[in-house]
Amino acid sequence: MKAFYGILIIFILISMIDLSQQVFINATCTVSSQCRPKCIEAIGQAASKCINRKCKCYP
């Protein structure tokens, strides 16, 4: 059981590190396709989402 908790803690820490790589840019949007060119310009990657009318880029 101790091994399970240890693996769970490691998984949570790795997930937090991965989530911290997201980049919000000050660009308004209504659909995710509007974020792609803005994210390519900002960080050089096309992976993006439109969340709460703001573009979120993923490196």
UniProtKB/Swiss-Prot annotation:
Site residues, Aromatic residue of the functional dyad: Y58
InterPro entries: Scorpion_toxin-like_sf, Scorpion_toxinS_K_inh
GO cellular component labels: extracellular region
Tagged with keyword RNA-binding: no
Region forming the signal peptide: 1-22
Places the protein is found: Secreted
Keyword field: Disulfide bond, Ion channel impairing toxin, Neurotoxin, Potassium channel impairing toxin, Secreted, Signal, Toxin, Voltage-gated potassium channel impairing toxin
Tissue: Expressed by the venom gland.
UniProt-annotated site: Basic residue of the functional dyad, residues: K49
SUPFAM superfamilies cross-referenced by the UniProt entry: Scorpion toxin-like
Top-rank taxon: Eukaryota
UniProt GO MF annotations: ion channel inhibitor activity; potassium channel regulator activity; toxin activity
Disulphide connectivity of cysteines: C29-C50, C35-C55, C39-C57
Domain notes: Has the structural arrangement of an alpha-helix connected to a beta-sheet by disulfide bonds (CSalpha/beta).
Family membership: Belongs to the short scorpion toxin superfamily. Potassium channel inhibitor family. Alpha-KTx 04 subfamily.
Function: Potently blocks voltage-gated potassium channels (Kv).
Protein name: Putative potassium channel toxin Ts22
